[in-house]
Amino acid sequence: MCGLLAFVAAPAGAAGPEGADAASAIARASHLMRHRGPDESGTWHAVDGASGGVVFGFNRLSIIDIAHSHQPLRWGPPEAPDRYVLVFNGEIYNYLELRDELRTQHGAVFATDGDGEAILAGYHHWGTEVLQRLRGMFAFALWDTVTRELFCARDPFGIKPLFIATGAGGTAVASEKKCLLDLVELVGFDTEIDHRALQHYTVLQYVPEPETLHRGVRRLESGCFARIRADQLAPVITRYFVPRFAASPITNDNDQARYDEITAVLEDSVAKHMRADVTVGAFLSGGIDSTAIAALAIRHNPRLITFTTGFEREGFSEIDVAVASAEAIGARHIAKVVSADEFVAALPEIVWYLDEPVADPALVPLFFVAREARKHVKVVLSGEGADELFGGYTIYREPLSLRPFDYLPKPLRRSMGKVSKPLPEGMRGKSLLHRGSLTLEERYYGNARSFSGAQLREVLPGFRPDWTHTDVTAPVYAESAGWDPVARMQHIDLFTWLRGDILVKADKITMANSLELRVPFLDPEVFAVASRLPAGAKITRTTTKYALRRALEPIVPAHVLHRPKLGFPVPIRHWLRAGELLEWAYATVGSSQAGHLVDIAAVYRMLDEHRCGSSDHSRRLWTMLIFMLWHAIFVEHSVVPQISEPQYPVQL
């Protein structure tokens, strides 16, 4: 694991003949993500003013081959042993198998025992095809000293982030956007707010890839690679991972074999995700996903420690269930209870770590459980991705409920929406009629919706009706034409909710605490098995993740297997009606200088209505409040979070 930063200087650019100025700037910017890798840090450069070149910055969190796999990593064939230079964030879990294959087929020689050299040797011998062979989470930048090209890539699902900015001075890539913002004078990119991205954020509660809220900074999308040269105006980006859900029927003759296939691929994935030279723990909520991962992990580490979090308020904690699950599988368990005071105090620090606003309150308890876990372990496993791959969200059952509408003539179906409009809000059947009148492409755009069209117009002075969710989702839906509706919803979530919310908080919030989070469900081999499941093996009228539950019967304790999903719930609705969080909310709105972007009076009205109980605006308010806090930190600079730099033992 590490935080990486790479700068490809334009020819005759501002870097100077020796690259010393650029190296100094890169070192300063890299320190802003020290938390991603407190074990080692440094820079490396090969720049001359005439032809440009490259500068690397890195912060290493050493997990595998602690003693030898220092960054940047150098490797090459015998005739050019230092041809390639790599900075790498992530882990390659099948690196042992890849190294053996490269030795056997190509005679590759390795100088370390780590996973990074598998990327370098694989790239040399297989080219970009190496990306199809990697089982892991990764974002990396690889400099070829012969072609003078920077090759960057991200893992298929977007577990690890990579931001890109291009300007007159060259192109920079980084694990964290704040590092690029620190390099704006060196690179020379546009730092104005992207109003389209802001509207997308308000609709979705996160900024969808490849956008960011700064016009000059984009994200390399999940499953893509980029080629960057000093003599090019912009990176050349190519998608290498194109997910497909191609269902294969389950029959009475093969059903158990299909469930066994799921069990086997999960066992293999967890076994590989346990590869580390440090202690590995696990996050444990009250659900089947994290419990399954922990139950499989303890086979490889009988002293497994599990961690969970909750709140003091009744109904907002799964600690009791997690404790029972830990006891059932024989794991030691540690719980962190978060108070309202702690919650409020941590918000500026958390938003600074996030880089982009993510209006998901669950990332706050995640921050505290990650901080607690880091006292005991350096790596944790977690259950993210199971819902998207195996059909775990309740909304995936909606096509079953709306199936009768599919038989209506289109004009009649549309009229159902008009019938629903005059019905009172909250009236039984209103939402069903409205959503039934819409096509899947119109009604479903991931697991986030809080503002109606009218409400968006109220809070965004620059609202534009053409900047809707459809300009984010339409290209994705175009790829899934002809699939069953559940598969299409899963596919949308891979490109929206999963990589825009779930994996952003999973990466940023754990790395804020120098803790590596691994997600065994998001493995290419697991996806290959899950993608062949038919809709009926995922969703029924009574349950979700049907096939996964069947596959986990021998692994997950019975009290968890069919329990309703809760996750890490947060009592935002209650806390925004009284107490410290409400006071903080009024103060945040009152001091905000984002009035040209957000209608401050409209947000005040929502706060007042929510406080007195006439409306539940909690999700809408949280979306606005997190943006205002983000704006105060990164644009106004009126809020300066206190960022600690704790010293952790390298070996743990």
UniProtKB/Swiss-Prot annotation:
One GO molecular-function entry: ATP binding
A biological process from GO: L-asparagine biosynthetic process
The protein's Enzyme Commission number:
6.3.5.4
- Listed SUPFAM superfamilies: Adenine nucleotide alpha hydrolases-like, N-terminal nucleophile aminohydrolases (Ntn hydrolases)
Q: Catalysed reaction(s)?
A: L-aspartate + L-glutamine + ATP + H2O = L-asparagine + L-glutamate + AMP + diphosphate + H(+)
Binding of ATP, residues:
S382, G383
Spell out the protein name for this chain. Answer: Putative asparagine synthetase [glutamine-hydrolyzing]
Task: Please give the organism.
Answer: Mycobacterium tuberculosis (strain ATCC 25618 / H37Rv)
GN (gene name): asnB
